[in-house]
């Protein structure tokens, strides 16, 4: 199990294995029945780490969607989007892709942030739904922590957003990983939480980056200003 450390995630503007096939493609309505904008989410499982493979299944991806829908809220606990499972690509399918993303991530050396978007765009040159966000589940590596690292990142990628989510942050583990990174996808930056400890309730986008305290629990919803940024960024995506 990886170390539970406080992770500073980055954004770029550059801010048991299953054989189940990807979910069938189809037109996705842009608005749910309750009026919330729909965000199609594609999960791509890119690691065959023995510890991670138990999460490489359709049921886990459904669970991750439920987590996003439950915790991606404003400070009055109002839901903002309707996240919907669009596609799921298991490791078995990912491993057959003919692109260099496999050499860019899950390797015993740090990723090169500047080259990741180009590799992703080569593997997935076209998005299959409006506003689609791709979440790549991977095994983070750093010189200091080796594969114990859990750093996750979000890239807005010129209108083709994606997330690198360390597998150990599935199940809402370690500072609301997927929810925090989805905040970056929709334009948000880190905020400071002075004197916060690991158990302090904090804003979803809180970070230890400012050196004034821990990022805390990241369990408090988005402020009105943050919500405005989220909705504005949503409108900018094709």
Regions found by a protein language model. Give the residues of each.
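Positively charged n-region of N-terminal signal peptides that target proteins for export
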Residues: 1-4
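C-terminal motif of bacterial Sec signal peptides marking the signal peptidase cleavage site
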Residues: 15-16
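Propeptide-to-catalytic entry region of secreted or membrane-anchored zinc metalloproteases
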Residues: 20-129, 235-238
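Extracellular/periplasmic catalytic domains that process cell-envelope and extracellular macromolecules
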Residues: 32-36, 123-131, 153-158, 195-199
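Active-site-proximal beta-strand/loop segments in catalytic clefts of secreted hydrolases
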Residues: 44-48, 88, 136-141, 166-169, ...
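Short, solvent-exposed loop/turn elements at domain surfaces
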Residues: 48-56, 76, 143-147, 212-219
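Catalytic zinc-binding patch centered on the HExxH motif and its immediate surroundings
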Residues: 140-159
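The catalytic-center signature of Zn2+-dependent metalloproteases
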Residues: 161-238
